[in-house]
Amino acid sequence: MTAEAPPDDDIIEPEMLLRAYATGIFPMAEEADDPEVFWVRPEKRGVIPLDGFHIPRSLQKTIRQGIFEIRLDSNFAGVIEGCASGTGERARTWINEPIRRAYAKLFEIGHCHTVEAWYEGKLAGGLYGVTLGRAFFGESMFTRKRDASKVCLAYLVQHLSRQGFVLLDTQFTTPHLERFGALEVPRKEYEEMLERALEGIARF
């Protein structure tokens, strides 16, 4: 991957961020308390084909039971706080204060969205990502109750398909995401997929 600091680590304007996504680049930080931000352009990119998403049987059962209430864009601050508060296996997080502010601005102008799982009136899990054209760039997810974030991911894939999106970018792949059909594609192939996704517009 390539990585370099932006001109001003404290300011990432929405226009700059969207231009970066349009060219296959996204920002990260080393840790939550590190004020610096760097740009990342991986040699291999994680994607989940919307027509190749796999839902494990146990999760299918959870979805059928309707344990969680799914909401969209109702609590952005709560979702990014949940994602930034690493616990357990996710004790470290890359979401620092400049990144929080940057994505809050994107949310305000309609280019950042959340999928939220609510249980008994409380936010139990969720995810957020960036939309541009017909692409959704998944950023992070969290869970406070078993399967909450997985249900959000399953809902996201269904929702994106309904709304006409053609690309779900996960940035990297993990064993967890591979269970759902995530795969790695070389940078050139990814950039071709991204170019096609940016040719149209889909509404989240």
Curated annotation (Swiss-Prot):
Keyword set, alphabetical order: Acyltransferase, Cytoplasm, Transferase
GO biological process per UniProt: protein catabolic process
Predominant place of localization: cytoplasm
EC number, UniProt record: 2.3.2.6
Enzyme class: transferase
CC per GO annotation: cytoplasm
Catalysed transformations (reactions): N-terminal L-lysyl-[protein] + L-leucyl-tRNA(Leu) = N-terminal L-leucyl-L-lysyl-[protein] + tRNA(Leu) + H(+); N-terminal L-arginyl-[protein] + L-leucyl-tRNA(Leu) = N-terminal L-leucyl-L-arginyl-[protein] + tRNA(Leu) + H(+); L-phenylalanyl-tRNA(Phe) + an N-terminal L-alpha-aminoacyl-[protein] = an N-terminal L-phenylalanyl-L-alpha-aminoacyl-[protein] + tRNA(Phe)
One MF term in the entry's GO annotations: leucyl-tRNA--protein transferase activity
Cited Gene3D superfamilies: Leucyl/phenylalanyl-tRNA-protein transferase, C-terminal domain, Leucyl/phenylalanyl-tRNA-protein transferase, N-terminal domain
InterPro entries: Acyl_CoA_acyltransferase (IPR016181), Leu/Phe-tRNA_Trfase (IPR004616), Leu/Phe-tRNA_Trfase_C (IPR042203), Leu/Phe-tRNA_Trfase_N (IPR042221)
Subcellular location: Cytoplasm
Task of the protein: Functions in the N-end rule pathway of protein degradation where it conjugates Leu, Phe and, less efficiently, Met from aminoacyl-tRNAs to the N-termini of proteins containing an N-terminal arginine or lysine.
Recorded family membership: Belongs to the L/F-transferase family.
Name of this chain's protein: Leucyl/phenylalanyl-tRNA--protein transferase
Organism: Brucella melitensis biotype 2 (strain ATCC 23457)
